[in-house]
Amino acid sequence: MLPLWIALQFLGSLPIRLPGMPTPEQLGRSLLFYPLVGLLFGVILWALNIALAGTPLLLHAALLLAVWVLLSGALHLDGLADSADAWLGGFGDRERTLTIMKDPRSGPIAVVTLVLVLLLKFAALLALIEQQQSMALIIVPLIGRAALLGLFLTTSYVRAGGLGQALADHLPRKTGWQVLAVSAAVCLVIAGFNAVVALLLAVIVFIWLRHLMVRRLGGTTGDTAGALLELLEMSVLVGLALF
């Protein structure tokens, strides 16, 4: 069970304490539990959505978004901000992009990107609440964290050393693909046709963002992985709200 606790601690802000320093193998196996963590977050959001029934719509959507951000501790938003600054400030240069990505300060591009992504998420949540598409709250966090597993299965990690390298080097790849297949099946059981739309959108966004990473960096980093999750979740939410 330790890999599950590692995944919960790393991906969320829940008060999880590990019994000791995990081994690289345990870190790698924790990736297999990322979709399960996403499912847990989704169930929490779905339950909150039910509890908020009758709340004014704008407040309803705002509270859902706030809890969504709090569940992850804004970890992935931080990666999105760093990636946005680095992508524009890097001027197409790999080393410059990686250097800017490590800078903890956020520039105007990062701020604008965060505002736009959160605004689109909020608007999509508002529309989904009106349309009573509550199952989206379960499957979107699941798909987003399954995408992280897919990214590490298909993409090299470009920063030597550290947590990301351990995740990439010790991920059980055959089991990883099986977990992705099960995750897709769970989405289909939960949301039916809407899950088909969500999965297709997720695959398209995943392929596009992965292509950008590989072309610029030759692989992924922790920051670009976080950016992928945020942009993919936002895109799927908007897509479900529109279709």
From Swiss-Prot:
Keywords: Cell inner membrane, Cell membrane, Cobalamin biosynthesis, Magnesium, Membrane, Transferase, Transmembrane, Transmembrane helix. Its main location: membrane. Pathway: Cofactor biosynthesis; adenosylcobalamin biosynthesis; adenosylcobalamin from cob(II)yrinate a,c-diamide: step 7/7. Its cofactor is Mg(2+). It is found in: Cell inner membrane. GO terms for cellular component: plasma membrane. It is a multi-pass membrane protein. The chain crosses the membrane at residues 31-51, 57-77, 109-129, 135-155, 188-208. It catalyses: alpha-ribazole + adenosylcob(III)inamide-GDP = adenosylcob(III)alamin + GMP + H(+); alpha-ribazole 5'-phosphate + adenosylcob(III)inamide-GDP = adenosylcob(III)alamin 5'-phosphate + GMP + H(+). One of its GO terms (molecular function) is cobalamin 5'-phosphate synthase activity. Its EC number is 2.7.8.26. It is an enzyme of class 2 (transferase). GO terms for biological process: cobalamin biosynthetic process. Joins adenosylcobinamide-GDP and alpha-ribazole to generate adenosylcobalamin (Ado-cobalamin). Also synthesizes adenosylcobalamin 5'-phosphate from adenosylcobinamide-GDP and alpha-ribazole 5'-phosphate. Belongs to the CobS family. This is Adenosylcobinamide-GDP ribazoletransferase.
